[in-house]
Amino acid sequence: MQGWGDRVSTGKRSIVRNERTGHIVGEDIEDATGLWGSFKGLMFRKSIPDGYGLVFRPARGIHTNFMRFPIDLIYFDKANRVTKVRPAMKPWRWDFTNAAGVIEMNPGSAARTDVQPGDLLRFEEEA
């Protein structure tokens, strides 16, 4: 059962595919838009389903304050090329960068789908 904090209402959802491997990185990737979506992110959630992720654009700094579980961070540039992967960032940590965007996902997601710096991500918008 989903609660008030389980989704960020944006309307834009994508499937993200790794062009190098062909693997689907996430089948339910949601854009965090607007002040509330960008502020709240994954805070206060007890968990997220496998394959779900949240995209922040731009990604100047990410924190895991008030989070209950670690997350994988997949940073990418304006061409959607992966610039950095930070696996299993624990709660109450900060990571600063100047990326065009970042995907926050369950820990192990990047390794399971073999995402590495230099990979090209393809965002396929859901209908």
Language model feature labels by segment:
Residues 2-127:
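Compact, glycine-rich, soluble single-domain proteins
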